[in-house]
A protein has these predicted regions:
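N-terminal subdomain of nucleotide-sugar transferases
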Residues: 1-64
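Acceptor-binding helix/loop patch of EC 2.4 sugar-transfer enzymes
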Residues: 8, 65-75, 94, 118-151
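Generic structural signal for helix capping and beta-alpha/helix-loop junctions
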Residues: 13, 45-47, 70, 108, ...
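A conditional alpha-helix N-cap/helix-loop micro-motif detector
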Residues: 17, 80-84, 146-147
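Short, glycine/charged-enriched secondary-structure capping and boundary segments
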Residues: 18-21, 50-53, 113-116, 138-142
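Internal alpha/beta domain cores that form substrate/cofactor-binding pockets in large enzymes
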Residues: 73-81, 89-91, 110-121
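Short N-terminal targeting/anchoring amphipathic segment
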Residues: 87-108, 121-124, 128
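Membrane-proximal helix-turn-helix segments that form the acceptor-binding/catalytic region
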Residues: 88, 107-110, 114-118, 144-158
């Protein structure tokens, strides 16, 4: 089976951060599946557009995007939507049988649902954060318009 795996913050063992998606994808490959990972490259890069690498049999499609925890909320939201738009286009260009998308951010649901409908294939959505409840509780989403939009995205995704 050809599996499209969407995770904006995919990490390999030599990168800092969690490797849950890497481990899942690696094991799916080991079971005989083809896995196509769509993710972002968050470090400085010479690449200006998508580039592909192979990691333990996983076809990893990287989109260079500038992202930092030091960004403002507005800057982060722009990055999330930029990645969603570009990954939606990339997703429909791949010939796959099923889509597996994992959050966070919740905007990963946008390219997953779009590609699922466009390609007429099933989609599985893994929720790994209670969003937007968590950022609201933490005080990160204070603006009423932002909260409203976050709740609309939540209804769409869930």
């Amino acid at each position: 089976m050809k599996i499209l795996y969407l995770h904006q913050y995919f990490n390999t063992p030599d990168m800092s951060g969690g490797t849950r998606s890497y481990e899942m994808a690696r094991r799916l490959v080991k079971m005989g599946h083809e896995v196509y990972m769509i993710t972002s490259w968050r470090e400085n890069s010479d690449h200006k557009t998508w580039y592909e690498t192979a990691v333990e049999g996983i076809h990893v499609h990287w989109l260079p995007v500038n992202y930092s925890n030091h960004m403002s909320n507005i800057e982060r939201i722009k990055v999330f939507f930029k990645f969603a738009l570009f990954s939606a286009r990339k997703a429909v260009s791949l010939k796959v049988d099923i889509i597996f998308a994992t959050s966070t951010p919740l905007t990963i649901a946008l390219p997953a649902v779009y590609a699922s409908r466009k390609l007429k294939i099933p989609m599985v959505f893994e929720v790994r954060d209670l969003w937007p409840e968590l950022p609201i509780a933490m005080g990160a989403l204070k603006n009423p318009v932002t909260r409203f939009m976050a709740h609309r995205l939540e209804k769409f995704a869930y």
